Amino acid sequence: RLVQQATAQVLDWAYDRDFSDRSFGFRRNMRAHHALRVITAEADQGYRWAVDMDLAKFFDTVNHSRLIRKLSLKIKDGRVISLIHKMLRSGVQINGEIKPTEIGLMQGGPLSPLLANIYLDELDKELEKRGHRFARYADDLICICKSRRAAERTLASLTRFVQEKILLKVNQEKSHVAYVS
């Protein structure tokens, strides 16, 4: 646990400054009420249709290979990458037996929130590139649009992006378009 905390501190220093200012989860001086304030301000400007996207079992389904590739773009020390990979695969105890983990992030681990933000940073950058107004808090995303039709198109295109490019599943039952009053 101590090694994970130390690793998280070093990675936080390297990554946090490059995260989107629309990413609010697990970050210094960024809280859920800040995300709410951003969305409220957008609604006051006429953006009244929200895409509420839920990523299905996000922490349990993060692709290790993809995450390691993302980390390797910034971290050039192979020993650090190897250490993180070992932490990811360290396993879970099931019926007294330790099983190595092939996918997912350990929930409650000191490194997991930061790794989650690193993994989802690509989604934030894509939303910014497309000019969307959004707020993301951990694995919860709200994207706000001017019309219902725009919101429905946005939900469809983001679902494709998340599933095809980021290799995550969107929870269709919990993801929807709603009017913001």
Walk through the language-model features, giving the residues of each.
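Short helix-capping/linker segments at secondary-structure and domain boundaries
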Residues: 11-18
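Glycine-rich active-site/cofactor-binding loop and its immediate structural neighborhood
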Residues: 4
